[in-house]
């Protein structure tokens, strides 16, 4: 681990009550979690490990970048020697593993990369954490591992039936993580969350993409019919969910992190058009919609029960109307937080295949 790859602000490992490793910390959700951890737990050292892929931005961490209990290390979870050394040097107590390739559209054309990063990288990380004797390992998965459903609500015991390469890679990684609990009683916890939205999300995902397209006077590109429905959870709420799992989650358990708020993709587009373009008629709203060919597979719904995490004291609080207005305003000012953000606005990924 080179001196150039890290920010030396912390004291020796023993000077903090806990040392928490957050992988993918320059990404969307993890950066929100890091900011909360750094500010709410001043006696915890928060170590951010990120390789700074295209969707990451250290601007997400500016509120805490100079804090004494925060450290950034640039590195790759797929580098087993580096990861082992990191655990030895940093004396990590807790891991929150967010680092992943997450864009479903991209997974269809770069499936091998998703397998490599999401499955192999997770295996490298959980094995290193096990060998280091970490006291809790939280693996961040997705509701998409359940596959789609029109009416059946999934709970944590529902079978995994993923339908796209991204979801398949996350499901496979879950199996590796869970095996360390089954084999060694290594204290792992798995979370599966609904779609999360809010500031700092790279604009390849549906909500920031639609917002950014409209703010650049371009139409919302809808895959297929747009009748697919998604549950949307605001970033501040999901942060509270992860802090709840961190403090109250039981080893070996899985927790759904969901919301009852559900909306079709076409309705989402229309609401954003009315909010941003202030359209006055249905025809005027429709003029800002462009229907394009669908994904190779596009699940209709991911209905999910979240009573298990509710029993730990967490429920979403931020109303859609409040969350979406904050999000729209953030992108109005911060779209260029990523140097390649314009690429994300194309209907389909334009990056070359991984292999």
Swiss-Prot record:
Catalytic activity, reaction form: dTDP-alpha-D-glucose = dTDP-4-dehydro-6-deoxy-alpha-D-glucose + H2O
InterPro entries (alphabetical): dTDP_Gluc_deHydtase, NAD(P)-bd_dom, NAD(P)-bd_dom_sf
Record: active site: 143 (proton donor), 144 (proton acceptor), 166 (proton acceptor)
Residues annotated for substrate binding in this entry: 142
Biological process annotations from GO: nucleotide-sugar metabolic process
Catalytic activity, EC: 4.2.1.46
Swiss-Prot/TrEMBL cofactor(s): NAD(+)
Family, per entry: Belongs to the NAD(P)-dependent epimerase/dehydratase family. dTDP-glucose dehydratase subfamily.
Record protein name field: dTDP-D-glucose 4,6-dehydratase
Lineage: Eukaryota, Metazoa, Chordata, Craniata, Vertebrata
